Structure formats: structure tokens, C-alpha cells
């Protein structure tokens, strides 16, 4: 059926309110808002100031991944902080049987006697976050280990990432998707 939700102030306050539907598995695919807003979908902990919030995009056609949360936050913070490749990304498979002798179970060995590592393809913002985690590791190595910025902080890491990001010249930044 069609539900109507009434929201009342318990104190004399004005402002906006936001509603989210539960995740998959708790509602049917037919359950929708009549006038949905695809923005302000970033949730905890990514909607707070400190974390580096990562969106995902398709690196083959430079489109934002449809399930990537969009900003800004309810409190007006500009999020996501950065977008990284997150669609059909190939990488090593976890828990797929690398034997104790260093060979892939049932897979033989790779070139020059190295173990063939089972590969898999994944999609999502977790994949994009892994890209950014690698970039952060490189920044920490450059800044702290190599001595270029020994007082590097979360804020400076975020600033380096944002300043170094490739931007589409047809778009204005910041924006709610990228």
C-alpha cells in the first residue's frame, strides 16, 4: 500500500528532515519514495568531517557508479571527498587456496616458478576505498618516511588527495557526485 509519514516538531525548531529506506533484504524491490532524492545518501561514518569518504566510478567510461552514495551530508559537509575506480576491478582473490608451499591450489605456477595467484573481479565503494588506501600509504611513505612532511595529518592527506585528483573540465567542483 501507500504509506503517509507525518513528522512533527517536539520543540519549536525549523529545518529539514531526511528519511532513508532500510537496506536490501528488509523491504521489497517495489518499496520506493514517490519523490526520491538521490543526494544526501552518505551515511555514518562517512558523513562526518574526519574520515576520507570515497565514491566509486567506472574507469572505462568515467561515469559515477550507480550505487555510490552522493553528498552532501545532512549537515552540509562536502562529501564524498574523492572518487576512485570501483567498477569491475580485477585483483587477487581472498581465501582461494594459496597453498603453504606457495603454489595456488589446483592452479599450477605462474611464470618463472612463481605461484599463480587466483584473481577475481569486484565492484563497489570498498574497491574504490582500497585504491585510496594505497594512495594514502604512498603519501605517508613520501611524507613521513622520506621526510617531505613529517607532521602529515589526516587533514593534510585529504588535502593532497583532493588537490591531486583528476577533474572533468566539463563539471564544476565540488559537486554532489564527484
Where are these regions (language model features)?
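Catalytic-core segments of hydrolase enzymes
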Residues: 1-91, 163-165
Amino acid at each position: 500500500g501507500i504509506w503517509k509519514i507525518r513528522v512533527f516538531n517536539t520543540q519549536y525548531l525549523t529545518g529539514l528532515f531526511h528519511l532513508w529506506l532500510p537496506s536490501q533484504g528488509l523491504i521489497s524491490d517495489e518499496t520506493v519514495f514517490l519523490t526520491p532524492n538521490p543526494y544526501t545518501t552518505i551515511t555514518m561514518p562517512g558523513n562526518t568531517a574526519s574520515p576520507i569518504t570515497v565514491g566509486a566510478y567506472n574507469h572505462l567510461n568515467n561515469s559515477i557508479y550507480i550505487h555510490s552514495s552522493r553528498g552532501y551530508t545532512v549537515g552540509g559537509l562536502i562529501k564524498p571527498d574523492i572518487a576512485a575506480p570501483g567498477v569491475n576491478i580485477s585483483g587477487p582473490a581472498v581465501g582461494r587456496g594459496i597453498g603453504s608451499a606457495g603454489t595456488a591450489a589446483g592452479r599450477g605456477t605462474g611464470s618463472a616458478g612463481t605461484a599463480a595467484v587466483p584473481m577475481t573481479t569486484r565492484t563497489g565503494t570498498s574497491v574504490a576505498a582500497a585504491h585510496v588506501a594505497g594512495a594514502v600509504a604512498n603519501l605517508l611513505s613520501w611524507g613521513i618516511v622520506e621526510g617531505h612532511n613529517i607532521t602529515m595529518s589526516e587533514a593534510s592527506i585529504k588535502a593532497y588527495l583532493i588537490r591531486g585528483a583528476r577533474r572533468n573540465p566539463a563539471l564544476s567542483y565540488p559537486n554532489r557526485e564527484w
